[in-house]
Amino acid sequence: MPDSEPSETEDRKDDHVRIIREEDVESGGTGLGDVRLVHEALPDVHYDDIDTSIPFLGAELDAPIVIESMTGGHANTTDINRALAAAAAETGIAMGVGSQRAGLELDDEGVLESYTVVREAAPDAFLYGNLGAAQLKEYDLETVERAVEMIDADALAVHLNFLQEAVQPEGDVDARGCLPAIERVVDGLSVPVVVKETGNGFAAETARRLADAGVDAIDVAGKGGTTWSGVEAYRAAAVGASRQERVGELFREWGVPTAVSTLECAAEHDCVVASGGVRTGLDVAKAIALGARAGGLAKPFLEPAASGTEAVVERIEDLKTELRTAMFVTGSPTVADLQETDYVLLGGTRQYVEQRGD
């Protein structure tokens, strides 16, 4: 391993984990609180017979739960990724790593291990890689395949985070040409491609463009969970970038709420992951009723991961129990049945959906 100071990218990854753990970076307002599943008093199913498994990008998961892309790119994150991956394997759910740009561009064995550890810890789990759309424009297909090979990935997520980049002191704000770059990767990559937001969600129009580009899944990552604008505001404050700090604070609440984004994306694509402020198995159930294939969570796993694999497993089993209970009291023996269950929209989410539908 080279004897050198941490790179700017490594420092940024370490900052992100620290800020998310220590600071108030929740935006709130997922809209899931406005979703009411209709109770079935005669569910006509045995609780123990409820099947939470789903098909997902050519594989089968034991439950429609995804550990969302969080970290990697700094030696300090290796243990976190190890715990997350091992827990995903033990519980039969999917997991993504954070952006692999550092692993591709830095000659550092410690950085590389922060990614490769996931496949070592989870030989049979569904794992997906992660690159930014801005990087796809710079990388040829062979380089993108290296990201897949790095963790023997089952899929690749391409993240869109241009609000974060606009606030980030060292951000890349050239958003031109991303869709053609995504299409090129979709056409040539050896594994399925998921396009995901990073806390600001997708509107239907963007989801339609992605569906037309042939992406295999859309991860909404809507407004309501971790606000990366807020995270970058803390980083900007730390380096005295006061203007970017103010912009970051101003846009903390920006985006399409998770519930709305899930509805709009599910109308355009048949494989949607609902994430962004998803915190419980009931939230997952609501998202599936809105049309999602699965629900994704990130921050709720961060503290358990610091304690080790078993703490993450316990959190996942809690989610599974909450989801199974929601399926039971809606009379949904399978996840496909849950997708068809009745729900009611209330409050601001109903207003948002009605206005967007006009």
Curated annotation (Swiss-Prot):
Location relative to the cell: Cytoplasm
Xref: InterPro entries: Aldolase_TIM, FMN-dep_DH, IPdP_isomerase
Residues holding substrate: 12-13, 99-101, 164
Main location: cytoplasm
GO annotation, biological process: isoprenoid biosynthetic process
An example Gene Ontology CC term for this record: cytoplasm
EC number(s) on file: 5.3.3.2
Enzyme class: isomerase
Entry-linked SUPFAM superfamilies: FMN-linked oxidoreductases (SSF51395)
Gene Ontology molecular function: any one: NADPH binding
Subunit structure: Homooctamer. Dimer of tetramers.
Family per similarity comment: Belongs to the IPP isomerase type 2 family.
PANTHER family: ISOPENTENYL-DIPHOSPHATE DELTA-ISOMERASE
Protein's recorded name: Isopentenyl-diphosphate delta-isomerase
Species assigned in the record: Natronomonas pharaonis (strain ATCC 35678 / DSM 2160 / CIP 103997 / JCM 8858 / NBRC 14720 / NCIMB 2260 / Gabara)
Taxonomic classification: Archaea, Methanobacteriati, Methanobacteriota, Stenosarchaea group, Halobacteria
